């Protein structure tokens, strides 16, 4: 029997999840949101905290799985028939669009977590009908269970699609563990699909975005804002592909390689498409874009607007894309859906129909395809690929591998028998350990030498933080391993105090040289010494504040060379702001408030709210501020690891007010005398203003929290220092 729903109070959800319920964000939209720090916790993982995907993947029979995927490619289903009898084009698009959300600015997006299963990605206009691809994969995912994640399966399906059509891929690595809830990412300011208010000035795309319109992966295939201008399209392509770490050659290879296969779908009026998966009815069971045009699928399929087939053999690897690009001139036309596209002039029908073998079509191209011919830089590369198919095949194989693996981090995270032996520069390689590591006795001796070197607690802590805090949990780049703080571009970043950093490194290098010259095969890297110096300084600072503590240290980091470091690709890791050091760049554009940038940085470091809180409080009293400013250094005993920051911030003896002379600075004055006692920034004051952060701060300001504060700080510090240590068990 159905539940009664017509009573006055019946059917009302007691939680704030109803469509008309007011959430805190509705009442206070400007409130700092720190919930992003607690998303995708193990508590939301149905596989449990003990589940280890890397270990489970090792049990996978990859060859059998690939055999099943190969069979799927030609197993056309009546409910969503395969174009040309082969699903290859569909699964290439699935893998591409899973990986293609990656952006180099903050490392977010990409294929690494299977996020295409969730909103908003599962309902983006550019991902229309990829829900069908995911449903086609379900029987295979069901069969192999936890041995293969959705994230890995999406990418592998694209590889198998290519291989099943005669292309030799560069390789495949597993290791992408699924997440179980949508990531809260900033995809743009627009409130409507395909909106483009992300631009300013002369079509300047705002940071950190990578696509030209809301709901697109890269560019509008019809041209900028639907304007069929190939040269203008090339500008959009260059910008968006650069923002996902692709150069011009990789860009050409990816577009041409992907468009060697399959087709676009614009058989009829797009207004006949039903709602996307997230907006669909219960009975639609997560499938969206139900079409009212004809049968709604097969020859009547509508995904977007254009109806384009690029190749005479759309289920085989070939050079037909470039042959058609250069051998014909094109004139503007419209698809059956009314979209702008191009058709070959003076050509004979040579393109197969996807469902009727008796029919042939004229060669067609997208505006974004013609960009590869009419942009002078792209044209030169395209013509070389046209004349040298082997170079094209190699470039596409490498670019596809980079596209689908860019957010996986260092090679030690790569799993499976198809991982290439060749190490690539974009993987940020570090040398293998080829020597005996330091012992506990050595560590103690090295700490003593570091503390006797004349370097201060603040200098050592600052150097260690600068080295390790470059880590991004999004694409697993950065971190202390490799010691790249010694190299360009990091050694010259404003936030790292280049002159002072050079002094610190010089003294640590002298200690390293002396130790490594002892012989016996035992060595220590600068990367390890930087982290060890921070540990030694924290132990000293804690001891002087009255708490004895040992900061955990695991040796094994190695020193990368400048040749192993792609300077251009490391530039986006330079912080615009780092609230942990009270730093805001004076020359780079800020698109977040300082406190928002702090939370953003904490999320990239995979920190929780309490960890963020204790680290800021500790780093302030240790003197790790940029420029050695005293803003937020709320203590009369700096370089001692005390909870003074929290005690004094929350002390009602002082009243805070904006500085009358300096924007962004606040002054704390004695309520009775008016005497100036402290200064702070927005990042400092947020721990007294924001109710949840204040709750954390109150814990550390309590009289019984002195030891807890030190131990919690050390735990959070160690987490950051080891964030990129995928070689150790944690």
UniProtKB/Swiss-Prot annotation:
Its cofactor is heme b. The record marks 93 as: Transition state stabilizer. It comes from the Bacteria. Formation of the three residue Trp-Tyr-Met cross-link is important for the catalase, but not the peroxidase activity of the enzyme. Bifunctional enzyme with both catalase and broad-spectrum peroxidase activity. InterPro entries: Catalase_peroxidase, Haem_peroxidase, Haem_peroxidase_sf, Peroxidases_AS, Peroxidases_heam-ligand_BS. Belongs to the peroxidase family. Peroxidase/catalase subfamily. It is an enzyme of class 1 (oxidoreductase). One of its GO terms (molecular function) is metal ion binding. This is Catalase-peroxidase.
